[in-house]
Amino acid sequence: IAREREVQRLLFDAGLAGVCVPRAYGGQGLTPAHQRVLDEELEGYESALRIQSPTMTPCLAVLLDYGTEEQKQRHIPAILRGEELWLQFLSEPTSGSDLASARTTAVRDGDEWVLNGSKIWTTGAWFSDWGLCLARTNWDVPKHRGLTVFMLPVDLPGMELRRIEMLNGNREFCEEFFTDVRVPDADRIGDVDQGWTVCTRWMFHERMLHNSPYVTWPVGMRAAGGGTPPFEIARAAGRLDDDEGRDLVGESRMLELVAAELKDRVAAGV
């Protein structure tokens, strides 16, 4: 991990990190097509893929989409330099793949939120510095409406992290326990009870970018134009000529249609 942090810093110093991230946050402010060319040139060289995957896909992208200006200025340059590694606090022991069934709670107490609950199957939590956490903030509305996203350091008082050893000996996954963990409201991502909106975009970034050989390529999709349709993003990046690019665009469109249908059902109280 230390070596990958070093490689990420070398990329940053050489102007090769955050190619599509706005210059105001330490990036180069270029296009996905520029990053695609860089990815091809980097083939065969040492990379920081292990730390980039959870950090930049999708955490950095979510910060670009929904972070406040102060949050972006504070964290994105540090991410690009390899000084901050991020993870996702999403899955829970009792929720399976239904993220909207999150039972980890966040209760407001003045300018802070108090988190209690647990998360599981988090990749790389043992070496990360910060995380995005989906928590339940309102039990009196349909489940998709009562969620909020927070960012928090992994070493806050009240947080316990345990590595999970798989049958093959792999220990990359972790589980975490939150006991009266206090998070400032300033570290909330997006509006209160609108976490599902954030999460939908969050999952879009993760799914679109998961199979990229160098996850730094699509990190700046938001910077390349917030609401840009996936088809246009893929075309600008030169990915419409490969099967993976077309598959991802098709899957993204399908997810958009499903999300729209679910949104209508939730609004109708179904």
Which residues does each PLM region occupy?
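Short Ser/Thr-interspersed hydrophobic loop/turn segments at strand-loop and sheet-helix junctions
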Residues: 15, 38-43, 135, 151-157, ...
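A short core secondary-structure module
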Residues: 116-162
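A structural signal for short hydrophobic beta-strand segments in well-ordered beta-sheet cores
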Residues: 104-107
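Glycine-rich beta->alpha junctions and the first turn(s) of the following alpha-helix
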Residues: 159-261
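A short, Trp-centered hydrophobic/proline-enriched beta-strand micro-motif
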Residues: 82-90, 134
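Glycine-rich phosphate/pyrophosphate-binding beta-alpha loops
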Residues: 95-96, 120-126, 167-168
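Short glycine/proline-enriched turns and hinge-like loops at secondary-structure junctions
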Residues: 30-32, 98-100, 124-129, 143-146, ...
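Internal helix-loop-helix
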Residues: 8, 12-83, 123-130, 256, ...
